[in-house]
Amino acid sequence: MNHLLDERKRRLSQFHEIIKKRPIETRPVDIPDGVFSQCEQCNSAIYNKDLEHNYEVCPYCSYHFKINAVKRLKYTLDEDTFKPLFENITSKNPLGMPEYEEKLDKGMRMAKMNEAFLAGTGKIDGQNLAIGVLDSYFMMGSMGSVVGERITRLIEHAAKHNLPLVIFSASGGARMQEGILSLMQMAKTSGALNLLDEKGLVYISVMTNPTTGGVAASFASLGDINIAEKSSLIGFAGARVIKQTIGQDLPAGFQTDAFQLQKGQVDLVVLRSQLKKTLSTLLKLHAKKVTS
């Protein structure tokens, strides 16, 4: 018996040596671009069709990918109900900033829009509303004079037609190429929201990743109901800048959606797949009966 066991060990050893010496053949696999995406949080490779079917949310860790304004409307509104407004208002270069026109052109190509804010009307489960979406693919969704004007006109349109208003924010803040003109939009958009308050119309603000700077410090934080989409960074300035300014250590994760909910900055944190249902419920609860 021992002889048989020794013989078996010897043959296994020979087999392993042969396998080790055998050259490994590798054949390159040509995978076309746009087939897979890598999750920023867990680094998993995800088949893009699976990602789209899952609302652009990682199936492994639930990280919410950034999406453009067109997809946002697709996931939020009833099919074929969106009617755009104010698309004829476009940005110029009022301060003559170098390379601003080139950045605008690049933003148009990346976002396939002529500005960072898409405004219009639509329906959610048959309920009419005014809706606006900031697109972070257009100059990081920054708010310049045209974005501020479109937002203000959308608010005025909602007030005039007795419509509830929903705005999705995704922005790095004020557009530095427009200087003080961009900062003025903070006061302008915030002041316009009084029109809805006077008429008893609900304004729902949905903060997505990221909502920062002058946008976070103005209309995005002034909703009657403030919602944060899961996986969103929300805050005014970066952690390093704040620490240098106040000279204090900051709480861990202080700009996350969970922290904002804990401290009362937002009322709800909602998964993207549940946003339409949540908005539909809120619109029904705050429906304003208009008698003609």
UniProtKB/Swiss-Prot annotation:
NCBIfam families: accD. It comes from the Bacteria. It catalyses: N(6)-carboxybiotinyl-L-lysyl-[protein] + acetyl-CoA = N(6)-biotinyl-L-lysyl-[protein] + malonyl-CoA. GO terms for cellular component: acetyl-CoA carboxylase complex. Pathway: Lipid metabolism; malonyl-CoA biosynthesis; malonyl-CoA from acetyl-CoA: step 1/1. This is Acetyl-coenzyme A carboxylase carboxyl transferase subunit beta. Binds 1 zinc ion per subunit. Belongs to the AccD/PCCB family. Gene3D superfamilies: 2-enoyl-CoA Hydratase, Chain A, domain 1. GO terms for biological process: fatty acid biosynthetic process; malonyl-CoA biosynthetic process. InterPro entries: AcCoA_carboxyl_beta, Acetyl_CoA_COase_Trfase_b_su, ClpP/crotonase-like_dom_sf, COA_CT_N, Znf-ACC. It comes from Acholeplasma laidlawii (strain PG-8A). Its EC number is 2.1.3.15. Its main location: cytoplasm. Acetyl-CoA carboxylase is a heterohexamer composed of biotin carboxyl carrier protein (AccB), biotin carboxylase (AccC) and two subunits each of ACCase subunit alpha (AccA) and ACCase subunit beta (AccD). The keyword Lipid biosynthesis applies. Component of the acetyl coenzyme A carboxylase (ACC) complex. Biotin carboxylase (BC) catalyzes the carboxylation of biotin on its carrier protein (BCCP) and then the CO(2) group is transferred by the transcarboxylase to acetyl-CoA to form malonyl-CoA. A zinc finger (C4-type) spans 39-61. It is found in: Cytoplasm. Keywords: ATP-binding, Cytoplasm, Fatty acid biosynthesis, Fatty acid metabolism, Lipid biosynthesis, Lipid metabolism, Metal-binding, Nucleotide-binding, Transferase, Zinc, Zinc-finger. Its cofactor is Zn(2+). Residues 35-292 form the CoA carboxyltransferase N-terminal domain. The keyword Lyase does not apply. Zn(2+) binds at residues 39, 42, 58, 61. GO terms for molecular function: acetyl-CoA carboxylase activity; ATP binding; carboxyl- or carbamoyltransferase activity; zinc ion binding.
